[in-house]
């Protein structure tokens, strides 16, 4: 079966995939897939096809590669995007380039559009062996699937069961032109080391190793899917779809293995980087088994796991706002820091109406300076007439500890007046 027919068969299995965004590096693999998709589009005019090239700026040839990719797309009448990204070498070039690449693609992906990549069978072998080197479990050893989600991006890999030799033969027959990335010869990169030094020897000894690895990866994937299916009912009982939190109130009744599996399932639902064995053990010890009065945290990638009242939360990395003070006047709106949105103070019927995140409060008008802060540790006078510590007020409103310094507090001069949307100081 030729490549075009294989591609057609894969697309037939996913009839909803009619808007495609091809990740186009300009290398042999993506050039072959671009050619195949262009041919297929002639047969299926309803197919929407665009290509995106990520300019990493890591090579002195990067500008020429972008020009080459643009020219190829122009020849095929395919809409072309080029996005420049900045790589942070301190995070590791391979990992950061991958993350930056997916983030750039996410910025351009349209509704109902799916990212298409040219991963093939030999790429699958490399991915499997790298996961094995890291000590991955079933999730990691499942490697790549024809359709999956990575960094919240839907990805379609229609060539995953095709060999590199098939792609090379197609490129030769069609007289395609492509770029050669000189970094592919640099064995300091783990994938290159496997590709250039290790796998040729394995293939010389065992000619069918790529097929065998692909079967093993599929077995691992299916076993992980079965575990997810068996855990599904239990998981749904403890997972809150509204705030995406996980209850650990009854975790002590589960085996340690089941606790870890439920944690992984939750992280997978949130598309959070899977923890290493050491990280998972730390989460179990420092978060699940910690004393109830503790507020432990654990960072995973760009997310932070937190615990409050026997539930686990996942939040972005939050800016410390406790020191911030913002002046504001009546009939003024200002933007709050760290993406907290806009707050407005409007005079209305001899009161000051404060609006923030669909919450409203009314305060008396004042001639004093009005200030927004994010921290107060004194006492609050309640409508019932008695005073209560600020901490107890937050607890009564079930506000997690880390959110308490992200709620705007209104001050008249140095006097606390309101935690917007939650409670007022009746002094």
Curated annotation (Swiss-Prot):
Its main location: cytoplasm. GO terms for biological process: tRNA modification. SMART domains: TilS_C. Belongs to the tRNA(Ile)-lysidine synthase family. This is tRNA(Ile)-lysidine synthase. The N-terminal region contains the highly conserved SGGXDS motif, predicted to be a P-loop motif involved in ATP binding. Keywords: ATP-binding, Cytoplasm, Ligase, Nucleotide-binding, tRNA processing. ATP binds at residues 25-30. It is found in: Cytoplasm. Its EC number is 6.3.4.19.
């Amino acid at each position: 079966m030729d490549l075009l027919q294989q591609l057609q068969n894969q697309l037939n299995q996913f009839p909803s995939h009619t808007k495609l965004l091809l990740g186009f590096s300009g290398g042999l693999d993506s050039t072959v897939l671009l050619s195949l998709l262009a041919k297929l589009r002639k047969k299926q005019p309803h197919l929407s096809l665009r290509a995106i090239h990520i300019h990493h700026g890591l090579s002195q040839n990067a500008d020429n590669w972008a020009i080459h990719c643009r020219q190829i797309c122009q020849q095929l009448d395919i809409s072309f995007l080029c996005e420049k990204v900045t790589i942070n070498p301190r995070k590791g070039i391979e990992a950061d380039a991958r993350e930056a690449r997916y983030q750039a693609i996410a910025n351009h992906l349209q509704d109902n559009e799916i990212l298409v990549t040219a991963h093939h069978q030999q790429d699958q072998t490399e991915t499997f062996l790298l996961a094995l080197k890291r000590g991955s479990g079933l999730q990691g050893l499942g490697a790549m699937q024809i359709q999956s989600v990575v960094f919240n991006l839907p990805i379609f890999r229609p060539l995953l069961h095709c060999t590199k030799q098939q792609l090379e033969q197609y490129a030769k027959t069609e007289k395609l032109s492509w770029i050669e990335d000189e970094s592919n010869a640099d064995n300091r990169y783990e994938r290159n080391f496997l590709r250039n030094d290790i796998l040729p020897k394995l293939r010389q000894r065992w000619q069918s190793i790529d097929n065998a690895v692909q079967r093993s990866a599929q077995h691992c994937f299916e076993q992980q899917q079965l575990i997810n299916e068996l855990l599904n009912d239990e998981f749904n009982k403890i997972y809150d779809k509204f705030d995406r939190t996980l209850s650990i109130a009854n975790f002590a009744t589960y085996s340690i293995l089941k606790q870890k599996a439920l944690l992984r399932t939750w992280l997978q639902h949130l598309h959070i980087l899977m923890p290493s064995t050491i990280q998972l053990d730390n989460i179990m010890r420092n978060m699940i088994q910690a004393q109830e009065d503790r507020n432990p945290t654990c960072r995973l990638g760009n997310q932070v796991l937190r615990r409050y009242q026997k539930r686990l939360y996942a939040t972005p990395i939050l800016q410390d706002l406790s020191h911030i003070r913002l002046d504001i006047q009546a009939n003024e709106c200002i933007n709050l820091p760290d993406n907290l949105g806009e707050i407005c103070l409007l005079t209305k019927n001899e009161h000051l109406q404060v609006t923030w995140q669909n919450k409203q409060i009314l305060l008396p008008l004042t001639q004093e300076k009005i200030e927004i802060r994010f921290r107060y540790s004194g006492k609050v006078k309640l409508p019932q007439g008695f005073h209560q510590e600020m901490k107890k007020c937050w607890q009564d409103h079930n506000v997690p500890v880390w959110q308490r310094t992200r709620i705007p507090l209104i001050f008249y001069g140095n006097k606390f007046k309101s935690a917007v949307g939650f409670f007022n100081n009746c002094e």
